Design a protein with these regions (language model features):
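Catalytic core of non-heme Fe(II) oxygenases with the double-stranded beta-helix
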Residues: 106-178
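A short glycine-rich, His/Asp/Glu-containing loop-to-beta-strand
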Residues: 97-107
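Residues at beta-strand starts and edge strands
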Residues: 12-14, 99-101, 125-127
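Non-heme Fe(II)/2-oxoglutarate
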Residues: 1-96, 111-115
């Protein structure tokens, strides 16, 4: 079958997975652990049902929920920027502006969760990411489906539809995943 006239347009969103370099991982953990008392709570601007949500970086508009601040060194901010540029280039996005808006840490405990939500940033097409800093030894008893555990799972939902479309992604997460 000749497919020389075939063209392809992906109607979903790509998910790329990186391993965080050890120095970036250690630096972020160290900042969180040593500066925790001075980190601003991020709960007011986040949807999570999580007690300990603290901001490491915010460069959005000042509001009653959050004001600009930065606890991250330039090399860490640059690492995030490089990953977002790689994502855009890998997806063949050629016209874009980048602006790192915020970096925060969620420390989750039993019965806490993040409901399904959308990250949009300043534009409709904002990029989102999740970095795994630490994981517990156990996520507790799986009550409903021990053969397909869901406790502690990250689930990324896509916006595509169709018979063969992938609509969600549940990676087996490890520390240093991004």
């Amino acid at each position: 079958m000749d497919t020389s006239d075939f063209n392809f347009k992906f109607l979903g969103q790509s998910v790329l997975r990186y391993q965080v370099p050890l120095d970036v991982y250690n630096t972020i953990n160290h900042i969180y652990e040593t500066k925790y008392p001075e980190l601003k709570p991020a709960n007011k601007q986040l949807v999570g049902k999580i007690e300990k949500e603290h901001s490491l970086f915010y460069d959005g508009e000042n509001s009653n929920k959050m004001t600009k601040h930065n606890h991250l060194p330039q090399d860490i901010l640059q690492w995030f920027h490089q990953k977002f540029i790689h994502y855009l280039e890998w997806n063949k996005v050629t016209e874009y502006n980048t602006h790192l808006n915020s970096v925060w840490i969620n420390t989750m405990f039993e019965h806490e969760y993040n409901p399904v939500h959308v990250h949009q940033g300043m534009l409709f097409t904002g990029l989102s990411s999740v970095m795994i800093l630490k994981l517990p030894q156990s996520f507790g008893v799986e009550y409903s489906s021990p053969d397909q555990p869901q406790n502690g799972r990250l689930q990324i939902l896509g916006s595509s539809s169709g018979q063969f479309a992938n609509v969600d992604y549940q990676p087996d997460i490890k520390e240093r995943d991004f």
